[in-house]
Amino acid sequence: MKIRLASGRDKPVRFGHPWIFSGAIAALPDRAGIADVFSSGGELLGQGFYTPHARLAVRMLTHMGEPPFTPKTIEARIARAIDRRHGLIDEHNDSVRLVFAESDFLPGLVVDKLASTLSAQFNSAFAEAYREPITAALQNLINPERIIDTSDNEARNREGLPAIRRMNNREECLIQSGGIRFAAAIGSGQKTGFYLDQRENRAIVAGFTNGKRVLDAFCYSGGFSLAC
């Protein structure tokens, strides 16, 4: 499939932007899939996954000069993402975000490691289309006890994807973050089950509240109060 951009709409892609909105495309194809993206002048700018009828029409997978995208690219990118976070796991922390969507060149895919469980979100048409090779790569590279789908149904709706029935996916697992044990509600809780990105903030707050009485208002898992 080929997609040609409207005149003057190629600059963001040339500078590495991961998204192309429908208004930047000269003619919108009817089917979803991998597409070669061209400038209005016919220059190949890269490859992306096209989603018809979505405002965010193309999520870029490669840019100018990069090798073509293939299913094997998925495992290689997941492996690189895992390697980048290797130093974030230690004796006090067994949980971390392993894959962060466009930041790891895997659009719409979010994977959190919660102890020996993986919480995965397939929030784009690209991630859904490659669900099987993504799952196989995660099994091969990490060998988790289980992979639980915690996809964001609002995000999936924007992509024209069916909702995930989370009522059958409610699980809980014990994790360690900052040396503290937490019970993460996977599937029934917020987002992927735990706010892993607040680990450093919890440590900062604990540093200046030590020995003090603390009110943790509107808390989710009580992470900040437990850290104090």
Residue ranges and their predicted role:
Residues 116, 182, 201, 218:
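Conserved hydrophobic/aromatic pocket- or pore-lining residues that grip, position, or stack substrates
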Residues 20, 37, 46, 118-121, ...:
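Short hydrophobic-aromatic micro-motifs
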Residues 202-228:
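Conserved SAM/SAH cofactor-binding pocket of Class I
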Residues 115-128:
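A short interface-forming secondary-structure element
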Residues 70-77, 126, 130-134:
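Short amphipathic alpha-helical segments
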